[in-house]
């Protein structure tokens, strides 16, 4: 393990979140025994005087992503999000569009389907899993980590949704933006102020090196001649910040980002660690006292963190399992827990008394899709415990 690359902006640090040791969330295993004995790493985040939040230690990428099975194309709320984003951007020049960390090409495919304009679409992604899907969609696939040395064409639009927090060297990433941008960069990331206000400790995991606020980003971008001219807080992914960034002058600033910076400067970060610990204890007590059989929905990273933080395993809940719609995950096991990932048919057949939604950022969509086939209690744990009964349907 190593220290994440430090920004020159870094100041003195204090612990913000400490989740002990956790397994690598995306390294699903083939057996229960492998899952229960999965290697663990410290998971602690610090904050400094410049409001930079980052992990205290970093796990090498070759360990983090050796078995990465996420496909954005199975996420219907995200697909809808992509269509909505296109309608916000279509008035801008968009001949060449680069999507950073574009996965299976879901966003660029959505853009492609909404216009007859001839677009040059480029997906820069470090995974080798999506080459064919992008090729079929006529999307140029650059299999690499994004940086300034890729020799890409200048782009009218660069988009990075839910990826900037994955880089351990924020400066190299921004250098790449400066090199390849000739227009607007749309940057979306989990907004850490909302994460901390709502005690979403499951947003902290090893794949996320940084947990961004607007204030330090404004300073960082300014060093590279980049300027924020708009900011929006979105509900997707449990609370997302969208920044509109440019290296050109024609875009008038809404000043919206300044209100977020003010909120960040006024927020009391000192109580976060203790408040999160209390949340973990309360949730553990609630689940331990829950009557009837329990299953879980959503084999996403946040679900793995949540279960491990609460110490929930097949030892404490022998019949528990996790339901997920991603076919490539089904049959595998959640690291640290020993729980197997099953499909919806298994859930509908067994009808456990309780179903805990781990992917709570999509809870409305998930609940609607489960009813009326599933008739038990559906429970979400964030921001507060909420129980949906079958009679409520």
Where are these regions (language model features)?
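N-terminal juxtadomain amphipathic helix
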Residues: 1-77, 232
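Extended interfacial segments that mediate partner engagement and assembly in macromolecular machines
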Residues: 39-42, 50-133, 143-144, 200, ...
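Hydrophobic, well-ordered beta-alpha structural blocks that scaffold small-molecule cofactor pockets
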Residues: 88-89, 110, 244-393
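Conserved SAM-binding strand-loop segment of SAM-dependent methyltransferases
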Residues: 135-149, 341
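A conserved beta-strand element that flanks and buttresses the S-adenosyl-L-methionine
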Residues: 159
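Hydrophobic adenine-recognition pocket in adenosine-nucleotide-binding enzymes
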Residues: 163
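A short glycine-rich, Lys/Arg-flanked "PGG" loop and its adjoining helix->strand segment in the class I
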Residues: 171-186
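Short, glycine-/aromatic-enriched active-site segment of Class I SAM-dependent methyltransferases
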Residues: 185-210, 214-221
């Amino acid at each position: 393990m190593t220290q994440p690359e430090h920004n020159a902006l870094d100041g003195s640090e204090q612990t913000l979140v400490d989740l002990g040791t956790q397994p690598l969330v995306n390294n699903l295993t083939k057996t229960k025994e492998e899952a229960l004995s999965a290697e663990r790493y410290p998971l602690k985040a610090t904050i400094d005087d410049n409001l930079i939040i980052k992990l205290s230690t970093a796990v090498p990428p070759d360990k983090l992503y050796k078995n990465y099975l996420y496909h954005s194309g199975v996420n219907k709320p995200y697909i809808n999000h992509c269509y909505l984003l296109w309608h916000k951007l279509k008035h801008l020049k968009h001949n060449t569009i680069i999507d950073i960390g574009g996965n299976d090409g879901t966003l660029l495919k959505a853009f492609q389907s909404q216009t007859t304009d001839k677009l040059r679409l480029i997906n820069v992604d470090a995974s080798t899993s999506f080459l064919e899907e992008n090729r079929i969609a006529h999307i140029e696939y650059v299999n690499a980590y994004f940086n300034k040395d890729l020799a890409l064409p200048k782009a009218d639009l660069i988009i990075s949704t839910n990826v900037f927090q994955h880089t351990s060297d924020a400066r190299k990433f921004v250098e790449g933006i400066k090199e390849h941008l000739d227009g607007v960069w749309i940057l979306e990331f989990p907004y850490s102020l909302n994460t901390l206000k709502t005690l979403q400790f499951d947003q902290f995991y090893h794949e996320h090196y940084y947990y961004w606020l607007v204030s330090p980003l404004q300073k960082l971008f300014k060093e590279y001649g980049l300027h924020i001219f708009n900011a929006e807080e979105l509900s997707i992914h449990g609370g997302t910040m969208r920044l509109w960034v440019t290296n050109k002058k024609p875009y008038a600033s809404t000043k919206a980002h300044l209100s977020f910076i003010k909120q960040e400067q006024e927020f009391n970060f000192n109580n976060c660690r203790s408040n999160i610990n209390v949340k973990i204890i309360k949730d553990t007590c609630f689940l331990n006292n829950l009557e009837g059989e329990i299953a879980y929905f959503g084999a996403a990273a946040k679900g793995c963190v949540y279960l491990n933080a609460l110490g929930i395993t097949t030892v404490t809940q022998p019949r528990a399992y996790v339901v997920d719609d991603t076919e490539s995950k089904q049959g595998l096991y959640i690291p640290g827990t020993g729980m197997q990932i099953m499909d919806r048919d298994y859930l509908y057949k067994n009808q456990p008394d309780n179903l805990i939604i781990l992917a709570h950022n999509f809870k409305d969509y998930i609940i609607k899709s489960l009813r009326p086939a599933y008739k038990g209690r559906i429970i979400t744990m964030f921001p507060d415990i909420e129980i949906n009964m079958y009679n409520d349907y």
